[in-house]
Amino acid sequence: MNSPSRPLADRRLTDRLFALALQKNDLPFEISVTGGSMSPSLKDGDCVAVRREDAYLPGDIVVFRQNGGLTVHRLLWQAGGRAVCKGDSNLFREEVSAEDILGKVIAVSCGDVTFSPISGQLLAALSYEKLLIFKAHGEDRQATRRDPAYLEIQHFLHGLRYSLTNEGTKR
């Protein structure tokens, strides 16, 4: 009996295998975003073009191997063969091996609109600020989400996503 989630699992496996094959040959590849951890920069269903780079900078949106799958998050910093990444809307960050980074997002397609990621440094700073607010509230998600500074950052990010999407449709 097929479960309803099987097609999604098949798509993830296909994306992962295809991405790994292209990455080994240093070719750009595309994958579909699933989930909301990168909202508002990326949303569920967006397609991202990814290219391997010699070096990655804080603020870059990167794709890395994690728990047998691929994850798309923002790079906060990298040192000593380790990288710290975080989804823009996540409260937690994760440490990954720099070897597991497959590439950097170079373009995003949402529907008929394609655009390049905006200032990664700005978004990394805002994402880090959200993390600091979360830590200040003792890692209490509910208290964090009620914090005026957190709400202001969220409002700004959602407005930015809306603005970028509407600008792209005018092209």
Predicted stretch roles:
Residues 1-171:
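Extended hydrophobic leader/signal-anchor segments used for secretion and membrane insertion
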